[in-house]
């Protein structure tokens, strides 16, 4: 997702909330995210088109971003934190792998 796409989604989400189209609580958004996961699984199971699967993944991303905004977190900062967290995990995993004489997990 490019920053422009992310910024656009955040702007549309904010506009929707200002218009009164908003979630009532976090649980509703979590339920929506779970529903989107189920729709992704179903689309894959039914061997639907890549475009359809991508659309469902986009819906899941939207739900996650909605939850972030609803909870009052800065989306960019949240993404930066998870990027750092994942990079640190990968660094540790690579060190363990190298210590075992391997170059990768394949």
Go through each PLM region and give its residues.
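Flexible "arm" and connector segments at domain edges
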Residues: 1-57, 61-106
């Amino acid at each position: 997702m490019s920053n422009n796409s992310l910024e656009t989604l955040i702007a549309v989400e904010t506009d929707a909330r200002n218009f009164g189209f908003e979630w009532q609580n976090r649980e509703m958004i979590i339920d929506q995210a779970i529903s989107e996961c189920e729709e992704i699984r179903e689309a894959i199971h039914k061997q639907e088109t890549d475009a359809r699967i991508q659309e469902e993944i986009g819906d899941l991303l939207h739900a996650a971003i909605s939850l972030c905004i609803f909870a009052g977190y800065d989306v960019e900062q949240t993404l930066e934190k998870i990027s750092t967290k994942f990079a640190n995990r990968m660094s540790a995993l690579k060190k363990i792998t190298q210590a075992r004489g391997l170059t990768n997990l394949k």
